[in-house]
């Protein structure tokens, strides 16, 4: 798995428009907090049980990739943690070009327990939208 900063990820997506850009957060998270435009929503887990479904996740990504396991799959979550597990599952299923977005959409907590102030997609000033 490759690990890229948000800015490196944005450059990759611009250079590879056929890459699958997947947000693994729950839909409600992205609605409240925001998300990059054009990102695919494929949750790693869902409310209320919050239990990951690796097989379901891999199957959903595989459908979007039309079975092309060499297609670049870029994974984004809140802070870059869920994407690690999701990426491992994709690699175990044979995907060969998996990218984890370091620090995720909101980034790490600062000293006051706030996000988007230290690092992450929003912090870096990259395009995002809120529904």
Enumerate the predicted regions with their spans.
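Conserved G/P- and acidic residue-centered "switch" motifs that form tight phosphate/ATP-binding loops
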Residues: 80
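Short, surface-exposed ligand- or partner-binding patches at beta-edge/loop junctions that are enriched
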Residues: 76
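Rhodanese-like catalytic fold shared by cysteine-dependent sulfurtransferases
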Residues: 1-20, 27-72, 83-131
């Amino acid at each position: 798995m490759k690990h890229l900063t948000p800015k490196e990820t944005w450059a990759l997506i611009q250079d590879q428009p056929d890459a699958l850009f997947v947000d693994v957060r729950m839909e409600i998270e992205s609605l409240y907090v925001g998300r990059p435009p054009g990102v695919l929503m494929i949750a790693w887990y869902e409310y209320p049980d919050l239990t990951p479904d690796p097989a379901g996740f891999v199957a959903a990504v595989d459908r979007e990739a039309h079975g092309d396991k060499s297609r670049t799959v870029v994974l984004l979550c809140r802070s870059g943690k869920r994407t690690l597990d999701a990426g491992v599952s994709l690699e175990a299923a044979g995907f060969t070009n998996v990218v984890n977005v370091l620090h995720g959409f909101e980034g790490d907590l600062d000293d006051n327990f706030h996000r988007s102030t230290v690092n992450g997609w929003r912090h870096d000033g990259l395009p995002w939208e809120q529904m």
